[in-house]
């Protein structure tokens, strides 16, 4: 839209609608600032908040307009008449200062054009799917997915005529292409949805292969399905999917980004065009994150690199010890690729192995439960990415609703324990796992 057209829409000039923060400092003497530095102040100007070093928490449901024309202009953005969302603050279902500052900082990690905050990881996923998928469309996804995501696609969207096909997380480019080609025969392929590494098996998806097959099979077509990837297990430190061709990156920000097991949040990062479509859906159904949780996320992002680095170092030491124990069948950890193909995917995509892994014990559910019940430092709880170490039993907990035959096909077995290593002392964690393993022989 031209400047003249925009002025004609509302009769208000853009420059008068809102006090703007100072221009962000992204580089000094030609040196581009790192995300860890930008997390301390990017997107926030203290002079707009009485000099407060940290952003206040804006606990308000609505915002006053400078003029009626300014209000009209803001609503043109909120309703999609003007691309890019509201230029000013309107109503807390649409936007707010805490959310906008946090969204700006999230974008920094992957050099994304834009980002959105949501009330949970699942609300981020659901809002994205509702924005991009229509009745009769087809979704192609990697498998396994987080159980709630599988339920959303198969059980809920399925009721509205949405079909899906999947391929195993470790599939080759040829296998991925065959599934996409089959999906094209069923209807409009609206979305390629990935989760890497897969939850809870820790198998990596070859994102670059998915991009190559998508670009080849849809070359010259008007409608090219975007690729969305759930990067919760590795991002934003150890894997940056946008750099490898993903269009959207989805997070449960509850995990590493929040990092203290004291908030629930989700996020989506990507191009302006796709984020605009998702923003309109978020505005409609009200899945935005609340101001207090957004403020807590800002706090957490300041220490994200420190926490993830420490947890990753701990996990490497703990996994090296675990794999040598007689009670352990195997440890599925990205630092120990099981196949040459997984090693190749890891080399091309990842900068670190993460701190969440799958531990397969010798035995079954009884042995897994005995191990979990004996833990003294690690907490028996679902989730991951917090400062504390967590352990859970996917088959009986997060993936309980998955049919038995599908769990078997996806290697979600009764002897599997999922562990997320935290920031404790690594040797203390090893001592805890050692005494717990003794409970099963």
Region annotations inferred by a language model:
Residues 1-86:
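N-terminal glycine-rich, Lys/His-bearing helix-loop that initiates the first secondary-structure elements
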Residues 8-30, 39-48, 114-327, 332:
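Conserved PLP-enzyme active-site core in the AAT-like
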Residues 44-46, 59-66, 233-235, 255, ...:
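Glycine-rich beta-alpha junction loops
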């Amino acid at each position: 839209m031209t400047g003249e057209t925009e002025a004609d829409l509302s009769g208000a000039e853009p420059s008068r609608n809102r006090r703007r923060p100072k221009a962000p400092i992204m580089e000094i003497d030609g040196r581009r600032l790192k995300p860890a530095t930008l997390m301390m102040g990017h997107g926030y100007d203290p002079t707009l908040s009485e000099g407060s070093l940290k952003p206040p928490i804006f606990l308000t449901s609505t915002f006053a307009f400078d003029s009626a024309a300014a209000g009209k202009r803001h609503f043109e953005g909120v309703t999609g008449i003007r691309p890019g969302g509201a230029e000013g603050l309107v109503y807390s279902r649409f936007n707010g200062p805490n959310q906008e500052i946090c969204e700006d900082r999230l974008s920094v990690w992957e050099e994304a054009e834009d980002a959105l905050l949501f009330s949970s990881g699942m609300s981020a996923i659901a809002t994205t799917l509702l924005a991009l998928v229509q009745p009769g469309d087809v979704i192609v996804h990697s498998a396994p997915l987080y159980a709630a995501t599988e339920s959303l696609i198969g059980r809920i969207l399925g009721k509205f005529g949405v079909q899906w096909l999947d391929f195993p997380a470790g599939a080759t480019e040829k296998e991925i292409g065959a599934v996409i080609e089959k999906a094209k025969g069923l209807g409009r392929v609206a979305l390629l949805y990935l989760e890497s590494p897969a939850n809870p098996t820790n198998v990596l998806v070859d994102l670059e292969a998915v991009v190559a097959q998508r670009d080849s099979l849809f070359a010259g077509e008007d409608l090219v399905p975007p690729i969305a990837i759930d990067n919760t297990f590795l991002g934003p430190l150890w894997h940056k999917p946008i750099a490898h061709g993903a269009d959207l990156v989805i997070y449960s920000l509850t995990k590493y980004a929040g990092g203290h097991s004291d908030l629930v949040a989700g996020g989506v990062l990507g191009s302006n065009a796709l984020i605009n479509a998702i923003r309109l859906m978020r505005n409609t159904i009200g899945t935005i994150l609340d101001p207090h949780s957004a403020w807590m996320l800002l706090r957490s992002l300041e220490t994200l690199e420190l926490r993830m680095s420490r947890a990753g170092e701990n996990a490497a030491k703990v996994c090296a010890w675990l794999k040598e124990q007689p009670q352990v069948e195997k440890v599925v950890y990205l630092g120990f690729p099981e196949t040459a193909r997984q090693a190749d995917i890891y080399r091309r995509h990842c900068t670190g192995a993460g701190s969440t892994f799958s531990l397969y014990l010798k035995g079954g559910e009884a042995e897994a439960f005995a191990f979990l019940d004996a833990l003294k430092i690690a907490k028996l709880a679902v989730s991951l990415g917090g400062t504390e170490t967590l352990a859970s039993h996917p088959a009986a907990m997060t993936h309980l609703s998955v049919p038995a035959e599908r769990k078997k096909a996806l290697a979600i077995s009764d002897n599997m324990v999922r562990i997320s290593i935290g920031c404790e002392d690594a040797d203390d964690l090893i001592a805890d796992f050692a005494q717990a393993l003794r409970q099963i022989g």
